């Protein structure tokens, strides 16, 4: 039987880079070149947004923890598409009575791609983007 020698995978510091950011009222663990689904934000497709509420940043060498945010840390994301999440069915029934109610809901989402995670004052200051879903009222 032949021995299979496993070659060690060469680790790139880019692979270990991640940031924990606050967006849409939640905290997200973001890595470069991956896409994530946020609550619907008011941005057009192909817009590049900058998130500055970085709680923690690891660039592969050292870990920076914010109090509450890391100073001069930015995450640039690109809006890929606006979509809707899976349908959630809520069914309420009272036993021995003729009371039944069935509701469905699909959450409005924005799919974004993380382009870069950076720290330092060499990046230009941009306006903060509010990434919260707006409440839709029906008549």
From Swiss-Prot:
UniProt entry keywords in alphabetical sequence: Ribonucleoprotein, Ribosomal protein, RNA-binding, rRNA-binding
Pfam families in alphabetical order: Ribosomal_L21p (PF00829)
Residue ranges the record marks as coiled coil: none
Free-text function comment from the UniProt entry: This protein binds to 23S rRNA in the presence of protein L20.
Entry similarity comment: Belongs to the bacterial ribosomal protein bL21 family.
Record note on quaternary structure: Part of the 50S ribosomal subunit. Contacts protein L20.
Official protein name in the record: Large ribosomal subunit protein bL21
Organism: Prochlorococcus marinus (strain NATL1A)
Gene name per UniProt: rplU
